[in-house]
A protein has these predicted regions:
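Ubiquitin-like/PB1-type beta-grasp interaction modules and other compact soluble beta-rich domains
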Residues: 1-69
Length: 70
């Protein structure tokens, strides 16, 4: 069994079972399918990478949700 990974999501420390992809993280956060952008350690993560790219211990993740308005 793998050790859990510790990441920071929108400024809050979190712990998840490893391995963890961006798609799995977004499912855990109940954000899958929404309108948002994801940043990892200061770099935007393309949606096309969500299913394959794994998070690493110590990653800093920011999820910015798009809000419509006028």
């Amino acid at each position: 069994m793998s050790a859990p990974i510790r990441i920071v999501v929108n400024g809050a420390p979190r712990e998840f079972p490893a391995p963890l992809t961006f798609a799995q993280l977004l499912d855990e956060l109940a954000l899958a399918g929404g309108r948002f952008a994801v940043e990892r350690n200061g770099e935007i993560v393309p949606r096309s990478h969500f299913g394959d790219e794994r998070l690493a211990d110590g990653d800093q993740i920011e999820v910015v949700i798009a809000v419509g308005g006028g």
